[in-house]
Every structure is written in C-alpha cells, then in structure tokens.
Amino acid sequence: MRERLGGFGVRAARLLARQATTPYRLIKSLSIKPPTRLWIAPPDIRTADSTVADEVRAGYFTYEGKTLHVAAGEAPFARFAPSAGWRRALTGFSWLRHLDETDRPMARRLVDAFLSSPGMRDDPALEPAVVARRLLSFLAQSPLLLDEADPDYYERFMQALAHSARLLWLALGPGKSRGAERLLCAVALVEFAVCADTGGAIAPEAMRLLSRELQRQILADGGHIGRNPQTPLDLLLDLLALRQVFAARGLKTPETMKRVIARTLPMLRMMQHGDGSLALFNGAGATARDRLANVLAHEETRGPAPLQAPATGYQRLDAFPALALVDAGGAPPADFAGDAHAGCLSFEYSRGTERVVVNCGAPGPHNPEAREAARTTAAHSTLTIGETSSARFLEPPRGAGSRLVEGPDKVTVERRAHDNETTLILTHDGYAAAFGLVHARDLTLSHDGRTFSGRDRLLTATDGGATKPADFALRFHLHPQVKATPTAAGVELALGNDERLLFSATGADVQIEESVYYAHPAGARPARQIVLAGKAAAGVDIQWSFTPLPPRLSPSSATVPPEEKL
C-alpha cells in the first residue's frame, strides 16, 4: 500500500521527526507499515450510552464539562476547542462506542474529517495518551468504520493506524511519555501488533515493552505505583479487552499480563465501598460504577476482599455493615506523583451502601480549578497542623500540574486483631521537619460492625525540627447525604437510609463546619465536616467514636398502652 499523507499523516510525520530520540527508533518506527486488513476487532467492555449517541447525531459534542454545537453535517475538528481537555476527549474517539450501525455513514464522515483536518499548533490530539486512546477506539470500532467502505477511505484509515502506532513507538522511548500514560501507550501498541496483519514486525518488542511497564508500575498487591485507586480500573478496561484479542487469535497471553490481571481485580474490590464506588484517595474522583462492575465480572475466582495492600499503602477494616478504608502510605515516586494527594492517615467510613466519612475527592472536569485545593491535607479526613499539608507540592515547568514531593519519610502500620475488634496503629512524620511533631492514629472497628472508634495523638519527633506554635485541626468530612446535628452528647448523624449515628469525642471541642464534596458525577456538592481543633503540641490526645443510635419511632409505630385502647 503506497502511503499518501493527508492532514493527520503530515502532522504525524512531522512529529515523528521531532520525537525520534535515536536513528534506531526512527528507522524502527518506519518499519510499521499500514495494514491491508485487520485480523480482529477488539471488544470494548465500556458501557455504551444511547443518549450520547443522540447528542452526536444532533451535533452536540460534550466532554470535560464543555459543549460545542455544530450544524448538521459539519465536523467539529476544525472549530476552536473550548479546552485542551475537550480536544483530547474529542480526538480520542472513545465516543464512537455509543454509535450503532445506523450511524455508520456519520461515523465514517467524522473520522475522515479528522484525518483530513490540518490540526492546530501544539495539538493535544498528538499527545501520546490521546494517540493511544484513538488507536484503541479505531481498532475496537473498525467494523462500524470499515464495513462497506470505499477503497480510498479504507486506505486513509489504515494509514492512520500505522501513523498512530509509529507515534506510540517513539513515545515509549526513553524520557518521552511518563507515568500511567506509558502503560496506555504500550497496551495500544500491542493491540495494533496483534490485530493488524503488518503488526508482526513489532509484536515481540511491543510485548516486551508492555511487560516491562506492567512490572514497573503494578505492585505486588495489585495497586498502581501512583497510588490512585482508579488507575487499575482504567488499565483493566483495556487490558481485559487485549486478553480477549489474544484468545480470539489463538495466541498465548503473556504471563506478566495474566499475573497483573489476577492481582488488580482483588485490589479493586479491596478499595470498593458498599455503594460500588472506589475510595477517594490520591486522585480518585467519581467512580464510573458501570465500568467497575463490568471489570469485576471478569474475576474468575472471588474470595473475600483483601484487608491489606502494603506495597501500595492501603488498609481495610471490614465488619459488616461497617467498612473503613485507610491511606497508610507515603508519596509515590516523582514520575507518578502528578495525581497524588497529601492525605496520609486519612480514612473513609461507610455502613452498607451509605457513605459516612469521606475525603473530598478529586474534582471532575466541571471544576478543574479546585484540583490543587482537593489535594491538600485539609481536604482529607485526618489531622492538619498550622493549616499546612503533610506533604509539599512542586509546580513543574510549563505548568503541567504540581507533583507531590517530600511527603512523610516514615509511615508505620501495625495491625492488631483482638477477640472483639481489630485495630490499626499508624504514624507519619510529615509534620516533623516543620513542627517537630508526629501524628499517631489508632483506628478500631468492632467485629460486630457497630462501633468505629479512633485515637489521634501528637508526639515529639525524635529527629525533627523544633516545635513551633501552631494550631491543629482534626477533620471528618461527611458525605453530602449525611445530615449533622449538634447535641449535648456530640453530633448526631442521619444517613440516607434513616440510620442514625452518634459521633462523640474527648480531648477537643467539637464543631460543625462547611465542606465540599468534589467527587459527585455532576460536579461539586456542598457538605459538612466535623472539626476538632486546638493548640498543636506534644501530648495532644483525642479519642472519638461513631456508634449507632436506636431508630426513631414514627407516630404510627408507637405502642399504645392497653388501658388507653379501652
């Protein structure tokens, strides 16, 4: 097939020339030829949404909280993008999965318009993660896009696949892509190698690249090195589809890939609350519960959820109906700290399907300006000193988003199981250098699931700085559905299912303040938080507990004495 460079091809060729780090990588990338056919169309295990299809048909393209409307028959690619995130989502083409066979002419026309478009300066469409997502989308939706296609369009499409694979090959070179996006690039490159009839030239090395990234990024307990609970979910959505491609082709699934899948599925269950959502730590926001359910349905053997993930740094206390998930880890390596939060020793607490204590979570696309505030220690259910975070954030060049650096150097975890309860004994020294203090936290859950209690102390750091005058604040952020009412005994909490809890504490005054919950699918929601405040000093000792209250009797259920019935 003779290559003809259209708009996308020209942009890809220019980027290839700029990104080649060595002559070998450039020459090797040029060995990736346009396919003449695809052996198989990979499945897409993400859920399709007919309402999104209706919006696309009507010319509405809504992504990352922004909407662009185009006239019937017009393509959106040459229009001014409302934001870089919107452009990434548009040109990643994940939205193709929502369309059906009746949309084939429109889908083909939109893809062809993108391939012919001139693009823009510093186009997000050519970022490695976007190229990888687009390649995966094009491969998965190839029946929709190629069935009954004319030869010229077919050729342009196949050339675009090859151009994308070349860009990914270079993106996986030394010092190019970083963090979790390297995993995405490697998955997409392997999928091309297995699906395209010309992929054999790079298949062995592409699989080695993927295995290397999986070994580097997925830890022994199944968590991701960046500590975001949602990253394994995002990975499995693509990795499970790739496993099915290997099976359909009659190829042996790489051992590293099989081990990673077997590890990450239980890890997802460990980090899952009773309502189906993942815990809000280190960049996790609103959970796409349908996607999580689809992924967990692929787990072949299911035992109890793990209680510990020591490599990733999480702990679980579980006694139905109560569940507590705890951040017991330090800062991830710098290359993977772009989403990390300063939430060491924070916890989330739920009862059945009712969330009680939460972290604020990562904001969605509706509220990107709140991202940095959501990463501070104050946005987590833990203790802060001097209105500062237990870790420091460093703004990198070009304003790409801050990375968490200089988090706690030492985090200790001990788990003690007793006859009637289990206790986590935790410490971190994130405030040692600035204030000469260590935060010690004990969390205890009774085995009948009734009482969840804790103890927070400030200790003198043995190798920290001098103690400085400062205030502390111990925060318990409440889910927006929880109603908090002060009482003489503490704070009464009314849950969404009408269950009531009493929060009580000793060692500090209890206050109720405003909070914000960023992890709602529709955007930030107002919430409340319980705050215990005082002067930070060695010897601070606060004990607190959540205990169920008896249900209120409604007038209709009140018992009437027999003599009053006469």
Question: Across the structure, where does each feature detected by a protein language model lie?
Answer:
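Extreme N-terminal leader/anchor segments
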Residues: 1-71
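Short solvent-exposed loop/turn micro-motifs enriched in small/polar/acidic residues
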Residues: 53-54, 308-310, 340-342, 376, ...
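Short, acidic/polar N-cap/turn motifs at the starts of alpha helices
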Residues: 58, 312-316, 346, 380, ...
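Short capping micro-motif at the N-terminus of alpha-helices
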Residues: 70, 326-327, 358-359, 495, ...
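Aromatic-lined, polymer-binding surfaces characteristic
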Residues: 74, 81-261
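Residues that flank catalytic or metal-binding motifs in active/ligand-binding sites
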Residues: 91, 185, 313, 345, ...
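CBM-like, beta-strand-rich accessory domains located in the C-terminal region of large
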Residues: 132, 368-566
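Carbohydrate-active enzyme catalytic cores, enriched for enzymes
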Residues: 219-362, 537
